[in-house]
Every structure is written in C-alpha cells, then in structure tokens.
Amino acid sequence: MTSGSSSQQSVGLAAKVGAGVLALWGVLHVWVGVEGARQFATNGTRALWTMFLGGANAPVSAYQHPTDAVTSTVQGHLALNFCLDVGAAGLLGLALAWMIWKQASWSAYFIALVVIGVIDNAFLFTQVTPGLIALDAGTIGGPVLWAVACIVTPFGLPSIRAQRPVGASSVPA
C-alpha cells in the first residue's frame, strides 16, 4: 500500500467536514477578490470603497472620497491590492482544504490554523469590530467558518504521534 492511499484512508469524517468548511471559506474569499477586481475595473475606486464601507463608524454616506486624482488612484490601488490578497488567501484555503481532505495533512491544518487565523482575525479586529466595515453575515461568516474548520478538523486526522517520517521503518531495530 502506498503512503498516499494509506493517508487517504485515514482521513476521518470530521477532517472531511473541516476541509469542506475550509473550502467554503476559500470560495468566499476568492469571491471577494474577484468582486473587488470587477468593481474596480467597471466602476472605479468609489465602487470599490463602497463595497467595503458601511460599518457603524464608517457609513458610506459619511465617507469623503478624495477629490484629487493622485490620492484617488493610490487609494483605489491599495483597496484593489487588498481584494486581490483576500482572493489569494482564498486560493490558499482551497489548497489547504484539498491537502486535508486527500492527504490528512497536519501541516495543512496548522497552516490554516495560523496563517488563515492571522488573516481572518486581523480583518475582524482591525476592520469589523471598530465599525469600519459592516458587521453582517458576510463579514462574520469568514471567521466563523475558519473557527469551525479549526475545531472540527483535528478529530478526523490521524494521530499526530502515530505519524513517522517518510522512509522510516515500522519494525523496531
């Protein structure tokens, strides 16, 4: 039996559920990247900012868009970069979900736990909780999906203690 098939057999239901939830997180974040790029390409900087704003402390109606071209261009490209980074994080989430589902990868789990955790919690605590971006199902959905995936996944992964390095013999010397 190859190591790929043995690790595939060792992926439990909880890990598959966690991987599915992480994949959903990835799709949500890829959508943000695509929608941000679409808004910027079709309607410019104002539309892109309108996509973000709307929190209790930053209502769309109160936000003053820059009037000079340089500031507007800089802000637009920074916001576009943010959207593309979010989309790239979504692709990372999809890749990690696949690795968990197919390979029972503890490495993928820990990358999701730490890297995606930093990404989502930075967004939550620097944008949503201060009231800059609206607190709604879309903005809280990502952190909730991440938390569910992190809580559920380990229960379906093989014991981390039972894993041996590739090429290690199971017969004692």
Question: Where are the regions a protein language model picked out?
Answer:
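Topology signature of small-to-medium multi-pass alpha-helical membrane proteins
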Residues: 2-173
